[in-house]
């Protein structure tokens, strides 16, 4: 029985709900003593919480003796039903029992918030305040936190505890600045509470700015940081705030303001000056102020910068020199990067840049030697591209052996972007992952567990709850339970694979994919490591493909959209980037609304973009626009999805006639360059895993 019907109209949802409830009642009547009748009773009870709460209470209470594994959930659902019946005291007293009745419950924080809410509705303020404080201590980032603080403040006001009310309202305004309750809190604070007026301090503005930065709301953070700096000319955290302000300006692409902020920090020679120097170099590069960037490399050599920081400044200078066509000077600068860097990755980056400039200026023999020197460094992440481009350089020189080098890429890094390129150039056979076992089409949940751990795990109450919730169709609740077990069994890969498979099956793609990326990276990227087929299903989720296909955008291969979701958000529908892109396909609100307007959809707010269907509807259409704009060229369209069409148009004009693999390496923005490689790699893997179909 499906619970979620968000896409249907209200009348249709209502009719569908009645049909489901009737079906569940038939199961209960026809098979009264079976487990399925007990499950039907639970489902019917949950479905009736809003419609017929009295009947819901009756059904859910009867289920308590039949389904003890769900005791904490049943208590929560009964409590919700009692609140609908305007019985807040009964609800609160029941909700209070959850932590003691089910000590390993994953609902304790949620129950604490609902308990506080129930006591507030019952006008028992001292209990409401107590439970709100407990809930905030357990999970202060819960969406219910702002309302809990608002109720706390209201209770303090009712009982004439005005200092406590003021402190709580202030906490609400500072820590949850984006919430509707924060606006109400500010309005309440602006009134005189018991003869005292209130005005935010400099410290208040700084704390509020940090909260906005945590939400990637850069514009709002800038306003608060500027207020802080205006009010606190001698504050000990002033330099720290200026650095945060400069970075926020960069995120907002306000480079003039960022430049002046960083220049001031560098001149002041404070603790933040070194980091500000690197940021200033980045801004000089973005603004094409090469002379100042070169000058900065000289002053950086005499300052207090660390080796990697000096290397970064020289790297930006080298990129500018390369952009100006001063290739010999660029090579010299990149060699300094390789010398200055403390970390192996920074040294490899410098050498890679040297080799790439040599390649793009047709010094193929020299570039091949440089790329092979990188391979010898054995720095993670650089080997496949160095082997590939050494082979490309040899190919340009018409040397024999390039095919063997392409094969070497795929032997060592089978599932990499560079193996995909190498396969295309050398006509290598399609590589199929090595599978440890041949799985039957359908396996019971418990059969996925390794034999030596199965009895122990099957007895675990959290595992039992997770499976029962999965069976009932409560996917989010099942995911919560199963995800909590991945931490407990983090050292047992067989168990983790079983849990991640179950998570993926209930639609919890983000935690499942996270497990795969953290614990199975080698198996997913290198050849010769036996890999269970279930791991590929977890690592490349296909559950949203029907939603993507349903958009009917013919220009978009659904696997390409899935690859973008995988790399943009890792299937986390609540993801927010540092620049404020939102949701599964990481849409900027302005871009989303431009697409909505073009296709006749209603305007959308930032919060609506967290809805997966809304995000996919707009994201797939935007991707389709870009594919049409660039004549189906994947690299151009994917780059534009990340960096914007204006930047990509400039790059196309600069590098017209280049092969696609060369164009990708020539993308000047490192973030975009790496992004394009990741998306194209994931796209290739999706197509390979689905037998090349689209």
Residue ranges and their predicted role:
Residues 604-614:
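A short, structured beta-strand-centered segment in the mid-to-C-terminal lobe
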Residues 556-563, 630-638:
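Acidic/histidine metal-binding catalytic segments
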Residues 619:
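Histidine- and acidic-residue-rich, metal-dependent catalytic cores
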Residues 594:
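Active-site substrate-binding loop specific to GH73 endo-beta-N-acetylglucosaminidase modules
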Residues 1-579, 585, 597-598, 624, ...:
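Acidic, polar-rich low-complexity tracts and alpha-helical solenoid repeat scaffolds
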Residues 585-587, 616:
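Short glycine- and hydrophobic/aromatic-rich loop-to-beta-strand nucleating segment
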Residues 405-413, 503, 584, 632, ...:
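Catalytic and substrate-binding regions of cell-wall glycan-acting enzymes that process beta-1,4-linked
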